[in-house]
Amino acid sequence: MATGGLAIIQSMKHKLPPSERKLADYILAHPHKAIESTVNEISALANSSDAAVIRLCKSLGLKGFQDLKMRVAGDLAKPTFQGYRDIVPHEPLPSISEKTAGNAIQAIQDTSDLMDYKELERAVSLLLKAHTVHFIGLGASGIVAKDAQQKWLRIHKQATAFTDTHLVASLIANADKDDIVFAISFSGETQEIVELFAMAKEKGITTISLTQFSQTSVSALADVPLYTAHSNEALIRSAATSSRLAQLFIIDVLFLGMAAEQYETTTGYIDKTRAAIQSMRIK
């Protein structure tokens, strides 16, 4: 059963025009009524219009209202989570731990729900063929880029991950046509990342992006755009906790997808690197 309707709406809501946002808010608040309604009925319930319903489905990248209803129905058939929750002043650690675990589960589940597996398969195929993958990201996304680099190196795949934008520009300037530039940016609007990505496109280098689920400046430049769910990180937004976990989840899916395609070779490399690391431990 198709899922991800609620996650897609939540991810895109902040970029919708007012008439469509009103409908989105109604569907999020009353999902059971939404799946039982026709276009005319849902527009009346939300004090909107039939045309706005059609525009909303188009903005969400869906085939139509029936597609949206099927995805929302799939969401409602799954076990429910508590959603994203923020901490409060002087909150005890057990409560913080519970909320953090819940937010992590929600971010990964929402991201899984809106995955485009055809695009993921394209990404895996391109990454397997690439000579070198240049992961680029700033701030918390830079940490994810570093994680991706170490995973690639462990299976004998050439990869870089630098947060110095001048150094990245130099790498792109000298990159080969069979390299890939993989940009990681939750907002998809970080100026330096957009400029570096545009530089890669001008050179004819294949580009893959990982951004929030939305049409962004970075995803618009990507040959293969990949997405995470738009998590509601309110007060503690600067920590980028849920979005970072969702990004790491996608990197893991790509890594394991590559490993599955070249299973014997990959396990051989992992065994070698594990042995090398273990040999350096104090006995």
UniProtKB/Swiss-Prot annotation:
PROSITE patterns: HTH_RPIR, SIS. Residues 3-79 form the HTH rpiR-type domain. Residues 39-58 bind DNA. It comes from the Bacteria. Keywords: DNA-binding, Transcription, Transcription regulation. Residues 123-264 form the SIS domain. This is Uncharacterized HTH-type transcriptional regulator YbbH. The gene is ybbH.
